[in-house]
């Protein structure tokens, strides 16, 4: 019973990568109090590539509803400001020299609904990533079976295992989304 070069654990690890990315993105959708992690997902167009904000500035929380972004390179202030505005976090930057202040607005019902939509978008991106991994795995299984490196029975059994892993990770994504949606909508 040979399974060729097929590693189900590697496929599961890649699927979990999508879940980890989703957790990171959902962590940026904060409600209520200011947190430096709110701006973690912000990518800045800098030095010819996209860079995370935390590689260009120091983010601090001087007050419960205020973030302070100290940009290290004066020439990057406008790029950081633009990235924050474009990030769909609903934050309006106020710049003073190399410091960008971000007031965290009280969340009204409309803004909560916008945040839920953003969370749904992130979750759908994660689901699509998981489905791509599933497709890669199933394609690999078909090739192994076609090249007689695996029996048809083994291919079908492993395809079922791939589907079970996919269903499990998609279910985890749905649970993460439901928890974040509840957190956002709780007044």
Swiss-Prot record:
State where the protein is found.
Cytoplasm
Q: Annotated Gene Ontology MF terms?
A: ribosomal large subunit binding
**What domain of life?**
Bacteria
Q: Does the keyword Protein biosynthesis apply?
A: yes
Q: Which Pfam families match?
A: RRF
Role description: Responsible for the release of ribosomes from messenger RNA at the termination of protein biosynthesis. May increase the efficiency of translation by recycling ribosomes from one round of translation to another.
Query: What name does UniProt use for this protein?
Result: Ribosome-recycling factor
From which source organism is this entry?
Bradyrhizobium sp. (strain ORS 278)
Q: Which gene underlies this protein?
A: frr
